[in-house]
């Protein structure tokens, strides 16, 4: 696998983890409004995004490639 593909996979891992982080933040927002159904929905979505990141990580590890975790950006509150 060339270096560009490895870099793109690492970037995708960060995007998946950012999405999970964002969904947890949205779930927290709905939880504060006592909208438990919405909060639960977004927590499920967060878990799905985390699982995606773990699949990419496991793929890279199984093929002997280094996983580089970067900082996860803070979500902008627009909701």
Question: What are these model-predicted stretches?
Answer:
Residues 1-79:
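Iron-associated oxidoreductase/ferritin-like identity signal
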């Amino acid at each position: 696998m060339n270096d560009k593909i490895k870099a793109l996979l690492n970037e995708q891992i960060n995007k998946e983890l950012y999405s999970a982080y964002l969904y947890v933040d949205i779930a927290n927002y709905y939880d504060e409004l006592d909208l438990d159904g919405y909060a639960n929905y977004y927590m499920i979505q967060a878990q799905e995004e985390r699982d995606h990141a773990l699949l990419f990580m496991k793929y890279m590890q199984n093929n002997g490639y280094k996983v580089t975790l970067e900082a996860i950006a803070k979500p902008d509150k627009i909701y």
